[in-house]
């Protein structure tokens, strides 16, 4: 009997010794009111700003307004599932999304959940979407080109890795087309891409995803979608989700391109959210912190120095203007935050100039620092020549008596504008662009009529990609980043030959109607008037 008592006593002592009382503490509040996707909650006294809270029926919300009596919560789920008196508890966490290689070639919503029907995302790493931007001492100057594949941009408005370049213009002027062409052009260049669709039609996003799949560009791209049918809170967090996915790649020393399409709708979503939360409205009913909304987002784009991995995020925010008014509130805000803008103009678009980039209004504050030596050597005064052309064009409308110099400027400018026309989804490498522009710089295209300039461009690309000599020169330019004197001379001869070949194939070509080749290219025997 005594032995049994001793055994029982030992068991009790052992259990007391190993007893671990776990207290499950959770701060729980009650829903006071609900409406328009906003819940007013009481009892969450210690909730933090931007913390995720969980309602009954597993509906999630974001704590945005922290007041003395109540907390304003923006809902991510169906507000019809919540009613007054329902309980709500803190999660103790801010919004986190999956990041890493598993996100590539996937289409996700603003919470990082897959919506492409390809099954769950197998990512072991999560990252918070609200972070501070990299500090000053972690950054490096922008001096490497990010090739868009668009002649008008790469030659006159160069974009560098780590830059924030705004694409701004009226609706239906080709802003998204520029962004998608840039994504397609990153194929084989070891640049990851994140496309964030904010407030876009689902049919439009589906077309974009299909095109990226067709071109093989989805292999290195993640698409984040907060469509027009999504709630304001989901549209509000979408760009932060996109840049968080990009930051993971940047931290690994990789280069990333992020496109926000578009931040006008993002600002409207934030305005809607703020007004529903009864925050005081400011100019155009936007809240007072709408500038910070975009600056904190765009400052997360950077090029890091080697100590921090040497990766970069290049941001292409898109802004839609009304009737070309770039002096409105949101456009001026984003212009002041970014490192330049690509301005698309409706009149250019309607006249057939595609992409409809207004070279005069567009600017890159990084400039030629983001260009290869090959491109720098041939661009020269191209932008100035087009500015002179536009100025002369305005004067030419008032009179027909023009001197020879003015006629030459007008003819040359018209040919350059024809040269920078480019079909969508057909990017051109910077090496090929540089060679094409030699013909402009050296005035070799003088003898080619404006209507045949596109043929000149096509023949140059064909020469560089098919001709044995051309392939060697193209390879040298890509590898070395410069055009040697020897190669430059060879290219001049090849371009003269191409232009003469085009001219000889034009029926009823009259050489007297066009300027001749510069003297250094003229043979002792005059060029035949074919």
From Swiss-Prot:
It comes from Mycoplasmopsis synoviae (strain 53). It is found in: Cell membrane. The record marks 362 as: Required for activity. F-type ATPases have 2 components, CF(1) - the catalytic core - and CF(0) - the membrane proton channel. CF(1) has five subunits: alpha(3), beta(3), gamma(1), delta(1), epsilon(1). CF(0) has three main subunits: a(1), b(2) and c(9-12). The alpha and beta chains form an alternating ring which encloses part of the gamma chain. CF(1) is attached to CF(0) by a central stalk formed by the gamma and epsilon chains, while a peripheral stalk is formed by the delta and b chains. ATP binds at residues 169-176. The keyword Ion transport applies. It catalyses: ATP + H2O + 4 H(+)(in) = ADP + phosphate + 5 H(+)(out). Keywords: ATP synthesis, ATP-binding, Cell membrane, CF(1), Hydrogen ion transport, Ion transport, Membrane, Nucleotide-binding, Translocase, Transport. The gene is atpA. It is a peripheral membrane protein. Its main location: membrane. This is ATP synthase subunit alpha. SUPFAM superfamilies: C-terminal domain of alpha and beta subunits of F1 ATP synthase (SSF47917), N-terminal domain of alpha and beta subunits of F1 ATP synthase (SSF50615), P-loop containing nucleoside triphosphate hydrolases (SSF52540). It comes from the Bacteria. Produces ATP from ADP in the presence of a proton gradient across the membrane. The alpha chain is a regulatory subunit. InterPro entries: ATP_synth_asu-like_sf (IPR023366), ATP_synth_asu_C (IPR000793), ATP_synth_asu_C_sf (IPR038376), ATP_synth_F1_a_nt-bd_dom (IPR033732), ATP_synth_F1_asu (IPR005294), ATPase_a/bsu_AS (IPR020003), ATPase_F1/V1/A1_a/bsu_N (IPR004100), ATPase_F1/V1/A1_a/bsu_N_sf (IPR036121). GO terms for cellular component: plasma membrane; proton-transporting ATP synthase complex. Belongs to the ATPase alpha/beta chains family. It is an enzyme of class 7 (translocase). GO terms for molecular function: ADP binding; ATP binding; proton-transporting ATP synthase activity, rotational mechanism. PANTHER family: ATP SYNTHASE SUBUNIT ALPHA, MITOCHONDRIAL (PTHR48082:SF2).
